[in-house]
Amino acid sequence: MAQTLSFNGRRRVRKFFGKIPEVAEMPNLIEVQKASYDQFLMVEEPAGGRPDEGLQAVFKSVFPIKDFSGASMLEFVSYEFEPPKFDVEECRQRDLTYAAPLKVTLRLIVFDIDEDTGAKSIKDIKEQNVYMGDMPLMTDNGTFIVNGTERVIVSQMHRSPGVFFDHDKGKSHSSGKLLFAARVIPYRGSWLDIEFDAKDIVHARIDRRRKIPVTSLLMALGMDGEEILSTFYTQSLYQRDGDGWRVPFQPDALKGQKAIAEMIDADTGEVVVEAGKKLTPRLLRQLQEKGLKALKSTDDELYGNYLAEDVVNYETGEIYLEAGDEIDEKTLPVILSAGFDEIPVLDIDHINVGAYIRNTLAADKNENRQDALFDIYRVMRPGEPPTMDSAEAMFNALFFDAERYDLSAVGRVKMNMRLDLDVPDTVRTLRKEDILAVVKMLVELRDGKGEIDDIDNLGNRRVRSVGELMENQYRLGLLRMERAIKERMSSIEIDTVMPQDLINAKPAAAAVREFFGSSQLSRFMDQVNPLSEITHKRRLSALGPGGLTRERAGFEVRDVHPTHYGRICPIETPEGPNIGLINSLATFARVNKYGFIESPYRKIVDGNVTSDVVYLSAMEDAKYHVAQANSVLNDDGSFAEEFVVCRHAGEVMLAPRDNINLMDVSPKQLVSVAAALIPFLENDDANRALMGSNMQRQAVPLLRAEAPFVGTGMESVVARDSGAAIAARRGGVVDQVDATRIVIRATEDLDPSKSGVDIYRLQKFQRSNQNTCVNQRPLVTVGDLVNKGDIIADGPSTDLGDLALGRNALVAFMPWNGYNYEDSILLSERIVRDDVFTSIHIEEFEVMARDTKLGPEEITRDIPNVSEEALKNLDEAGIVYIGAEVQPGDILVGKITPKGESPMTPEEKLLRAIFGEKASDVRDTSMRMPPGTFGTIVEVRVFNRHGVEKDERAMAIEREEIERLAKDRDDEQAILDRNVYARLIDMLRGHVAVAGPKGFKKGTELSNAVISEYPRSQWWMFAVEDEKAQGEIEALRAQYDESKSRLEQRFMDKVEKVQRGDEMPPGVMKMVKVFVAVKRKIQPGDKMAGRHGNKGVVSRIVPIEDMPFLEDGTHVDVVLNPLGVPSRMNVGQILETHLGWACAGMGKKIGAMLDAYHESGDIKPLRTTIDDVIGSGPKGEPIKQYDDESIVRLAEQTRRGVSIATPVFDGAVEADVNEMLEKAGLKVTGQSTLYDGRTGDAFDRQVTVGYIYMLKLNHLVDDKIHARSIGPYSLVTQQPLGGKAQFGGQRFGEMEVWALEAYGAAYTLQEMLTVKSDDVAGRTKVYEAIVRGDDTFEAGIPESFNVLVKEMRSLGLSVELENSKVDDLGTTAQLPDAAE
């Protein structure tokens, strides 16, 4: 077969061990954030045609605003965004917020009101665009830039609006009786609780206030007692029949009961059922078939029933008995004497139907609607006298007013589902029918029908993403604004104003600022590496406003629930107080329009699994039988086994294959991104997998990233979606490449309005939020063809477009002199020497020159009393050079501050006059390197206030920036020219010219030779005979001119921004930021980990020659403790070790063949081996079809080790590992003989050796080590501060004091508690004594003792210290008191 395919070497090729084909594509990993915010802003939608959601819905809900008299109205028309003033990069550098100005079109309508009739007519309409503050925009990577730092808004999980039924689990009452309750939770508005008490009376509560009988609530809705009873109960009619009663025969009500007395047919008088017999469904059916219509009943059987209607004398209007009254010996004669021979009775048997509502009605003191409304009013507004109008208005506002009460679409959908209603989701308030349905359902629950709700089911919890959180916040801002607008409309002459004059946008802007700046859900982005960024954006938090609190959250909320499957990861959650409250979205999960998390499934049609994918939420999939993704299938897609393991209604079961409706899409759909990156996850204990997923997020980007030999296939997805690696926006040819940018000439998706050139700026040594280094490196060379979506540059922690958090290290599992006790890690010096685990960290230092009362501070090189040596790294402006190597105490920016004038003696004045000595007026406040930090200056930024003269350094930085912009413009212009003139020459060629440049002969046919005689700029002068061609040329000229001017305009705008002064905090004249790159080699005390939760601290770095070595002389890099595996049950690391060993062995084999090919030129053996080991390329294409050059490239890539992918729950098994080891020519045991580096002797037993992917975590000893001699003290207690950040001391705590007491070290202890801590006078004396060379000193009273005395005095206790002196005999003599 012809080798047609080529491989460019820019992608990592992995051998794939997965057996299950991927049917569904994984959604973009940061879609959650982007989709939600796009839906909120709707920037792309036309201003007039936006649907009512997001920002549009907020404006619609607050506007129109009417003034108090109704004489004028302010209407909302539409809104639009202007382009942002600064782009993302400029905002990062200048500490600004990336936002776009929001302009809202408002219409002010003024009415004329006829004083007699009150009729309104429009007098005046004014429309105007009003600026409503800036709205932060989301960057392409799903983050926000607020004051120059990247932030992420975490999505919140909260209880969905709707109705919930629950019981108290028998906790409220000593008998353990279950008290049922229903709660209607709106999106905003009052909560309604309906609950039973221990006496089975039903009560209602509004907003957790005092309870009222539920019948009062129903009366307030306009029902009377009879209507309430007829709504909740059916009726039977008892008809007088001689001395007994005739009752309709109701088989359904009698099912399962015992006949108390004989049952007699009312028509025939025969006994149909004996007393004491059980009424089975079969018996009742037989009676019905025999034609039994009615039974005969006695008065005794009528007693205890309740009347269904009032017993009224219609002539006189006298009410004998009311509906709901009990029939007994006293009341029955009253009914009969009044001449009633038919009595309607409520069907209450106290077994299937309880008398709860009837009893509540009987216990309710309120008789009618007015009483009920007044009662509710008193509960809601205690102390205010109710009137009918105010009570009615308040009751309506509670649940029936769309302004105050909003169920939201979600709430309505949930209510419909739970109560079997069919109401459109536009009805957002409660209805009378809803409340009745809730009470009915609650009573049925009490009667033993139906199930209560599970609050932790994901069908009852929903996600509020950025857009929705922002919408709620903006609504609050607008409501604050609304009050101000109403007041202003009433107080101002409305005829003369424009909408602009009524609006003060500050409250709205402040609400937005407050949300992004200080909301609990707005977090500083975790930017240690690309994985931590992605995970942060996919996080779901149950905390935050309107959510839970750590203290109140119980075990159930935190636990894994069956509905989490495929929606929320059961593994990834923090250890500690937040466990289970902060979760991560599963890989394939997405959030639907109602905020419920959906998971994808494959449809099964006629027993065959199809590739059709449906997304279902937890409410929807409970009714299906769902098979697992790894169920065995036949070739036609049917199930191979008769019974299939499946999930149904939260249980795992075996079901016949015909019952299965759906199947999982992928085995990794149940875990999160971080957990899906752990190979052999299925072989690890869940607790260790949790640590593994959490620790991958803390891996520091290394100097040289290296993708893992043993991956899972998720690595490239994470690198692409996180935005760390740069993907081409459209196809084209690489025109220029250097370390800072890539220029690509586009060849597809060419749009005349867009530039034909894509310039990608690479980030070089930028600081991330966690001080790690963000650095991008190009992967393409000039002339490369690039397709859309190809990776063209690697970022931090990526390697050929794969996530690369650590390095592959050769590991041996064995003890080594006790240096791997308690999970310690022993490293070889080679790792330090070759910079294997070296990382770069970037620290930012900032200094401001302010305008003080005594005069302005100055940034300068001229600093008093500082040697020239200390200034060696500063330029003439007093700012450090880029590239200077600095150490603790070095000056980075020289700064002097004026100090207060101290009175001068006449002699000093004379000297000052003679020598002009000025230096004593200022003090040195330069910024110096903090202790323990060494590094190299990589960047300096200087910011000046508007109108402040720029120094030489600022000018130089500005010139450099403008040159960079000019180079971009010139390159783009050059490519544009080349393309346009190439098209022009094609258009002109072969045509007869009727005009041309000077000296051109008319009528000549144009050829390449003729045209190229003239300079390019003169080609436009040619005019051709053919009108159509001439028209095309003129169109091209117009397009070219437009592109050129657009390019120039863009350049001018950017230059203007660079030259403009910066916005500074008040009082700041100038600010300098210095970035220092610190190289951190690995050293003892650093924390390292594998991907399986196997973490440890480096205990020692051993010379290479002392490390154990293999038979071929290779020394191992890392020695781990074998005891760390069995008890922790993370066997995945051992399988990874073996597979990594096979990969490296295979790589060696391929390397040897590659060398042989370079010598002999025969590529066949190399091709066969690579095809056998890897099989297919990055897009699944067979390697057989690669050309020779591609095979060599691939061999070069796999030389260090073959990369493989073993997806979670569908990866390599033991047999695969053995096969790989055999192919690589290694022992199947995975063990090798090791030799001791110190003696050269072989160890007694064989040792497991292989490659593990090790990570260096962001817990570096350099950041933690800390020492203090003198430093700051706390103001009140005068004790040293604590912590490295405050340059504090070590705490000598209670237990340490016990230790010194136990040793009897009295003087040491006294020092610790006094002079070394808070005895102010004592510490000064100690210092003086040491200076004198004397070592005697006396401890005084600790300051904290004085604080205690003062605190006791503040409690009104008189505490005095008595001065007394011990005389020679040991008795105390009273001293005279010290002078007060």
Swiss-Prot record:
Molecular function in Gene Ontology: DNA binding; DNA-directed RNA polymerase activity; ribonucleoside binding
Entry keywords, A to Z: DNA-directed RNA polymerase, Nucleotidyltransferase, Transcription, Transferase
CDD domains per UniProt: RNA_pol_B_RPB2
EC number(s) from the headed UniProt entry: 2.7.7.6
One Pfam family matching this protein: RNA_pol_Rpb2_3
Entries under InterPro entries matching the protein: DNA-dir_RNA_pol_bsu_ext_1_sf, DNA-dir_RNA_pol_bsu_external_1, DNA-dir_RNA_pol_su2, DNA-dir_RNAP_su2_dom, DNA-dir_RNAP_su2_hyb_sf, RNA_pol_bsu_bac, RNA_pol_bsu_CS, RNA_pol_bsu_protrusion
Residue pairs linked by disulfide bridges in the UniProt entry: none
Record-level GO cellular component terms: DNA-directed RNA polymerase complex
Catalytic activity: RNA(n) + a ribonucleoside 5'-triphosphate = RNA(n+1) + diphosphate
Subunit structure: The RNAP catalytic core consists of 2 alpha, 1 beta, 1 beta' and 1 omega subunit. When a sigma factor is associated with the core the holoenzyme is formed, which can initiate transcription.
Family note: Belongs to the RNA polymerase beta chain family.
Job of this protein: DNA-dependent RNA polymerase catalyzes the transcription of DNA into RNA using the four ribonucleoside triphosphates as substrates.
Protein name from the UniProt record: DNA-directed RNA polymerase subunit beta
Organism: Sinorhizobium fredii (strain NBRC 101917 / NGR234)
